[in-house]
Amino acid sequence: MRSYLRFSDRHRQRPTRPRKRVICSSAHFICSRMSPAATAQSPFGISLHSLSFRLLLIFRGSIVAMSRRFVYKLDQAVTAALGPNGRYIAMVGMTASAVLLTFHYKFREVIAATDNVAEIQSPSKLFYLRLLFGRTRSRITGSVMNINIMPALRDPIYRTLASVGGIDTEEIRYPLRSYKCIGHLFARTLKDKEREIEDIGTQSLASPADGVVTALGDVSSERVEQVKGATYSLRAFLGLMPKVTNPEKNTLKFVVLHLKPKNYHHFHAPAKFDVNVLRHMTGETLPVFSSFLKRFNDIFSVNERVVMSGNWKYGCMHMVAVAAYNVGNIRIDKEPSLRTNELRVVLRHLGGDVETRTYSRQPFEYSVGQHVGEFRLGSTIVLIFEAPHNFTWDMKPGQEVRVGQRLGGVGPIRRAQTEDERLFAFY
């Protein structure tokens, strides 16, 4: 009987041995991953590596007991807060958090591997913004906007949208019921004489779109204001750093125009402008309204955009159409094959290529006010151009403008003398 009891005691003690081996293995693993500095001698005459290993072995019982108490207390707290099924909810939450953190880590790893081509100041913020305002959600909204509406329902639906959104139905070229879907309504054309060129002189700059001036000024560094209080990298935004051809007489200037949903969604040439290069940079579709831009840097340099680079009277000019949330579609009249917000493409700031089209032999020649392209549901136009030091702005941030209205220029306004000079086509 005694031998049996002794055998039973030995048998009951056996399960404790693997636990000791696990703790020893864990301690060895932790210590083996310590930095080389940890192998230095401690005040006790042994290396920190060995000292840590021995301390873990000495206090292994306390560590196990503390771990058990922590798990027990955590389980009690979760059950009290979330009910009997709280532990399962917590498990799902912790799993989701682990997956999210893994994707976050991988996103930052990709940004670092591509040498941060967009010069993003906070990759973590961008990651979580992508979760909220992803390209897929913009495409879904675009699909909904392009659903055909029954002719009998178009007039009441469009009039409700117009009254809520502040759309002026009197200036729309065609009857409301002629627009098949909401997307077509936002891409509407205007009646003749609804917009005029205020200054036809070659020394001035006309507004390329209806909207609000959110920022303007001189380019003094590689980072430019997208709105007061937030900046973006000009080099990443354009794909190059623009240079002033005549630094003694000229300087680089910029202006940002935000198109609201109620605005006319087409954009026009701001001056007599020859386009030599067109660059399409794939990107996000993050919101571009002022209150959002104030809180986050680098929105312009990561959003999808089409950059038209060329020359005007005083030197270089870059006209950039920036996509926004629910506005993945950017259409350029002279490049009908251009497609934006496409599926399964590598975004520029994640290492994707820039689609470049050059027209050095036969550049696109635009006259002031000539139609260039259109958005869907509002977005942003950015102008970066070379101008003389005595170029003055006629507008201020926060001021609303209309197509053809003078943004600034050199000297007095030159008014149109004939009907042909004053009007331009919206077709």
Swiss-Prot record:
One of its GO terms (biological process) is phosphatidylethanolamine biosynthetic process. It comes from Toxoplasma gondii (strain ATCC 50853 / GT1). Its cofactor is pyruvate. The keyword Nucleotide-binding does not apply. The gene is PSD1mt. It comes from the Eukaryota. Catalyzes the formation of phosphatidylethanolamine (PtdEtn) from phosphatidylserine (PtdSer). Plays a central role in phospholipid metabolism and in the interorganelle trafficking of phosphatidylserine. GO terms for cellular component: mitochondrial inner membrane. The modification Pyruvic acid (Ser) is found at S379. It catalyses: a 1,2-diacyl-sn-glycero-3-phospho-L-serine + H(+) = a 1,2-diacyl-sn-glycero-3-phosphoethanolamine + CO2. Is synthesized initially as an inactive proenzyme. Formation of the active enzyme involves a self-maturation process in which the active site pyruvoyl group is generated from an internal serine residue via an autocatalytic post-translational modification. Two non-identical subunits are generated from the proenzyme in this reaction, and the pyruvate is formed at the N-terminus of the alpha chain, which is derived from the carboxyl end of the proenzyme. Residues 78-88 are mitochondrial matrix. Pathway: Phospholipid metabolism; phosphatidylethanolamine biosynthesis; phosphatidylethanolamine from CDP-diacylglycerol: step 2/2. Residues 1-77 form a transit peptide. Binds 1 pyruvoyl group covalently per subunit. InterPro entries: PS_Dcarbxylase, PSD-B, PSD_type1_euk. It is an enzyme of class 4 (lyase). Its EC number is 4.1.1.65. The chain crosses the membrane at residues 89-107. The record marks G378, S379 as: Cleavage (non-hydrolytic). Heterodimer of a large membrane-associated beta subunit and a small pyruvoyl-containing alpha subunit. This is Phosphatidylserine decarboxylase proenzyme 1, mitochondrial. Belongs to the phosphatidylserine decarboxylase family. PSD-B subfamily. Eukaryotic type I sub-subfamily.
